[in-house]
Regions:
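Asp-based phosphoryl-transfer active-site loop
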Residues: 2-17, 219
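Residue-level marker for buried hydrophobic side chains located in beta-strands
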Residues: 4-6, 62-63, 208
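Active-site phosphate-binding/coordination module
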Residues: 18-118
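Structural recognition of alpha->loop->beta junctions
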Residues: 54-69, 74, 125, 130, ...
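Mg2+-dependent phosphoryl-transfer enzymes with acidic/Ser/Thr/Gly-rich catalytic loops
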Residues: 1-2, 20, 181-258
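Non-catalytic pre-domain segments flanking phosphatase-related domains
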Residues: 1-6, 25, 29
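Conserved acidic, metal-coordinating active-site core of Asp-based
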Residues: 98-101, 105-218
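Short hydrophobic/aromatic-enriched beta-strand-loop microsegments
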Residues: 59-65, 80-81, 123, 225-229, ...
Length: 258
């Protein structure tokens, strides 16, 4: 059995718009030929509605939260880890104090905050709400993922808060930086651990493709690790194959070239 692990942002979508409709068509052809499709992403489940329901991308598994949660084709949970409430609250407070855009998901709800304005968060956008953010956060028993965004698109604050998190909570969480974003997930979670989990439980031949730094563990874990010609040179050097679009990789798989 062959299994494709595909990143979302920068791979299938850019600014929440499909990069090419041919990618979806190719994934459907791959699935029709008996392959399994997995989306391997830093997104949480509440951010996947547009892709799965509205745009109708086919899937058999979901690796979410940079490996923190793995779901089957019915969206039933196969694997899940959480960040302890006390740890998550500290990290969120640091982000709020630094006036970064912060957001979290506890598996059922997702909220963000910037400039002391709270938002209900989804893949359809951010809806302002009147609640005090940290008071709202204390109602969550734990967190699946916490994300921090430096709004000026620089990385100095991201670098500092990453260091602070790792110094105090390095045995509890992992940090996955991606440009001016930082995803914080439970320890021993990455896209690569998601690939390995499904590989061990299905004995599939794995093909992985992504474009950014948080995709490296996935690219390296796959039997055939792939990236794009627009990815950083250091990422391209780690990959077995380099493409312009996902559908090119699918064509090579179905054509027996890889």
């Amino acid at each position: 059995m062959k299994m494709v692990f595909c990143d979302i942002d920068g791979t299938l979508y850019r600014d929440n718009k499909q990069i090419s409709p041919l990618n979806k068509e190719a994934l459907m052809r791959f699935r029709d030929a008996g392959g399994k499709v997995v989306y391997c992403t830093g997104r949480h489940i509440l951010e996947m509605g547009m892709i799965l329901e509205k745009d109708g991308y086919p899937f058999d598994y979901l690796v979410l939260n940079n490996g923190g949660a793995i779901l089957d084709g019915n969206k039933d949970t196969l694997y899940e880890k959480h960040i302890e409430a006390s740890v998550g609250l500290d990290i969120l407070q640091w982000g709020v104090d630094a006036n970064m855009f912060v957001h979290m998901c506890d598996g059922k709800k997702s909220y963000g905050c910037f400039n002391h304005q709270s938002f209900a968060h989804s893949d359809q956008g951010d809806i302002p709400i009147p609640d005090d953010y940290m008071t709202l956060m204390k109602k969550s028993p734990s967190f699946q993922i916490i994300s921090l965004n430096q709004e000026n698109r620089q990385t100095d604050q991201i670098d500092m808060i990453k260091k602070r998190i790792e110094e105090k909570y390095g045995s509890y969480v992992e940090c996955h930086p991606n440009l001016h974003f930082l995803d914080v997930v439970p320890n021993n979670c990455s896209k690569g651990t998601g690939v390995n989990y499904l590989k061990e439980n299905t004995n599939a031949t794995t093909y992985t493709i992504g474009d950014s730094w948080n995709d490296l563990s996935m690219i390296e874990a796959g039997d055939h690790g792939c990236t794009f010609d627009y990815a950083h040179d250091a990422i391209q050097k780690k990959a077995d194959h380099v493409y312009s679009y996902v559908y090119e990789m699918i064509d090579d798989i179905l054509g027996g070239k890889i």
